[in-house]
Amino acid sequence: MSHEIFEQAKPILKKIQNKGFKAYFVGGSVRDYIMQRPIHDVDITTSATPDEIESIFDKTIPVGKEHGTINVVFQNDNYEITTFRSEDEYIDHRRPSEVYFVRDLYQDVQRRDFTMNAIAMDLNYRLYDYFNGQQDINNRVIRTVGVPSERFSEDALRIIRGLRFQSQLNFQIDSDTLHAMSSQISDIQYLSVERVVVELKKLIMGNNVKQSFEVMQNMKAFNYIPFFKSFEMSHLHIDEPITFELWIAILIVQQPKDIQLSTLKISNQEKATIKKWVTLIQTLPKIQSKQSLITLVYDYNLNDIEILLSLHHLLKQNGLTTANHLIINEISIREANEKLPIHCRKELAINGKDILNHTNKNSGPWLKDTLREIEIAVISNQIVNTKEEILEWVDAHVKI
């Protein structure tokens, strides 16, 4: 069975093969193809060295040439092509001391993390499965390639990746693999927090997050991760997928600590989102009327009903005060959203410049306050969202 994303990349494999080298699709794209899951990009592995790949293709980017990876730009798409490689002893539980380029596919896939990710596929969709990865996929089992303790000693991030796959794919972890994870969990303290957070963001949004989160708690994994080790993670209950930012916000409100978000090495946008969720969580108990709910839905752009319902559930589950269920429920949230005449300040019929021209005043803090009062008046249906009516209302109600 063909697949569009592989068909688009076939010419790359053909071009490499025409030069006398081997080339295969490998990793997550092959796994997802077997599972009939959405495929977003493909990884290609080859017997050609990075220098040879650069000589074959016109446009290349040496993103990780020293580790065997060349980015090939083909028909306006980027493809990562990595040379078959073998690795020397790992240092710091995260990177090999030396990488060797090899010409044999088996040598390459035997260094990979899990059997389901160690399957290669040629351009004719023939599979090369040396470690029974298809069988493990069919049985929904996560198992390391070879000895679990060796794989996790090479890169401790594989422990978190395994738990992330459990959450995303709803697979069970092989008992030997799980035992090695638990025995070597302290090694994740040597990882950069950025690498761990990338995996946690995916884990917390998986459909099987409840089981994976509990496994992490039982292993005391959070004791070895910056930021999280400052909290009592056993007190937190997560039984449904949520965003990373919402997870952190619930944790901060549940257990107030003087811990900087910068410890997580996340973006300023993510920090702002977390702070927004913290404020929302602290605001929810104050929602006592339909009008206050309408204002809340407007202020936080809560047009995704499921997010607010999920938050409401998680707060109750974690012993945090939230709004009365008679005020916040699916029907009331939907009604509040539908009643909003506008959904953001940009939809107001006037802007700050209009008010300045109308009042002949200089700009200042009063302008921001006035715009806020106008927003409340419009969303509470005190006035219709037209320029004329808003300016009349300003003249009559706003002290400037």
UniProtKB/Swiss-Prot annotation:
CDD domains: NT_ClassII-CCAase (cd05398)
Name of protein: CCA-adding enzyme
Enzyme Commission number, as recorded: 2.7.7.72
Keyword Lipoprotein included in the entry's annotation: no
Taxon lineage: Bacteria, Bacillati, Bacillota, Bacilli, Bacillales
Quaternary structure (record): Homodimer.
GO biological process: RNA repair; tRNA 3'-terminal CCA addition
Top-level EC class as recorded in UniProt: transferase
GO molecular function terms noted in the UniProt entry: ATP binding; CCA tRNA nucleotidyltransferase activity; magnesium ion binding; tRNA binding
Function of the molecule: Catalyzes the addition and repair of the essential 3'-terminal CCA sequence in tRNAs without using a nucleic acid template. Adds these three nucleotides in the order of C, C, and A to the tRNA nucleotide-73, using CTP and ATP as substrates and producing inorganic pyrophosphate. tRNA 3'-terminal CCA addition is required both for tRNA processing and repair. Also involved in tRNA surveillance by mediating tandem CCA addition to generate a CCACCA at the 3' terminus of unstable tRNAs. While stable tRNAs receive only 3'-terminal CCA, unstable tRNAs are marked with CCACCA and rapidly degraded.
HAMAP family given in the database record: CCA_bact_type3
Keyword set, alphabetical order: ATP-binding, Magnesium, Metal-binding, Nucleotide-binding, Nucleotidyltransferase, RNA repair, RNA-binding, Transferase, tRNA processing
